[in-house]
Amino acid sequence: MIPVIVLNWNGLEDTLECMEVLLKQSYSNFHVFLVDNGSEKSDLNALQENFNNNDKVSIIANTQNLGFTKGNNRIIEMILRDYLDVEYIALLNNDTKVETEWLSNLVKSAKTNEADIVSSKMINYFDPKKMDNTGHEMLNTAEIIPFGQGEPIENFNTVFENIGSCAGATLYSTKMLRHIGIFDEYFDTGYEDAEIGLRATVLGYKCIFEPSAIVLHKISRSINKIRDYEYVLKIQLNIFYTYFKLMPLTVLLINLPSFLFKYSMVFLINIVFYRSFFLKMLSDAFYRTLFKERKKILESRRVFFDNHKAISSLQILRKQTFFLFFDIRRFIKFVVLRKPTDFER
C-alpha cells in the first residue's frame, strides 16, 4: 500500500479537483490521508460529505493550521509507526492535477532506478507548455532552486539525478525516512523539501526525476495565502540554515569566495537600483543568522554530523551548479527588465 498525503487549508475547490483525479489512479493499492489543516468549518464539512464513505480516503481534522511541515510530519510519523510494511510515502499538494499513471510511474521508477526520492514532472497548470520544476538543483552559493522552471516541457523526457524534489508531488522511501528523519520542524511552510532533499543527497541517497509522473501544478496557489515580508525573510533564513547545517566544512571553505562575491554583489545591486524590500530582507536575514539563529544552526549541525556519515566533499562539490550563469539571468530578468519576482506578485 502507498499512502498519499494531501493537505487542505481553505482550498476546498482546489482540493476537490485534486481528489477527483487522484482517486482515478491506475495504481490501485494506495490510500489517501486527506488532512484538513485547520480550515474554516465549511471546508471540513464538505470534505467529510464527499469522502467519508470512500474506503480509499481517511480524513484527519487538525484544530489549527500546523503548516506544511508539521501537517505532513504528523501523518508521516503515524505511517512509519503503524504501517511497518509500507515501502514508500507520496506527498501531493492540493493545488495539483495528476495524470492517471502518476503514482504507478513514481513507484515503478523508484524500484527500477533504486531511488529513495522521486520527483514528478510538474507542469505549469496555467501554461501547460512550460515546466514548473523537475526537482531541485544546488548552487555553490547556498541556494537550492527549482530546476527547469519556465522551460519547455519537451526538454525534460529522460530520467536524471537531482538534489531532491518539490514536496508538492513526490515519493519518499520509508527506508530513507527512518534513517535520515522526516521534515525538519525548523521550517513551517517553504524550503522543508529542499532541506530533506539535500540531507538525503549528503547522506548518499539517490534522488531522481521521473518524466512520466506528470502533474499539473497551480504554481504558488497555496503559498499566495501566506506570502508577506516575514515569509520572504523566513525563506532566506531557511536557505542559510540548510546550507550551514548540512555542508561539510571543506565544502563551506571552497564555496566561500563565491558566497561572499555573490552576496556582496546582491547588496550592491539592491543599493544602486534602490530595491529597498530586498535590501532590508537580506540585511535582516544576515543579522538574524549571525546573531539570533547561530546557536540553533550550530546545534543542528552538531547533531547531524554526530549521527550521520556524509559522502565525500568532492562528491558534494560535483553535485553543485556554479552560481554565476543562473544569477546573471536572474539579474537581467528581475533588475534590468524589471519583471516581478515571485515575492512581488
Q: For the regions a protein language model found, what residue spans apply to each?
A:
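A conserved acidic beta->alpha catalytic loop
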Residues: 12, 21, 36-46, 64, ...
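Short, acidic, metal-binding catalytic loop of nucleotide-sugar glycosyltransferases
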Residues: 20-29
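Glycine-rich, basic loop-to-helix element that forms the pyrophosphate-binding segment
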Residues: 61-82
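Short beta-strand-to-loop acidic/aromatic patch adjacent to the donor-nucleotide binding site
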Residues: 84-97
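Conserved donor NDP-sugar-binding/catalytic core segment of glycosyltransferases
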Residues: 96-139
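A recurrent flexible, glycine/aromatic-enriched loop bordering the glycosyltransferase active site
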Residues: 131, 151-172, 194, 224
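A short, conserved alpha-helix in the catalytic core of glycosyltransferases
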Residues: 163-216
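Non-catalytic, C-terminal membrane-associated alpha-helical segments of glycosyltransferases
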Residues: 252-345
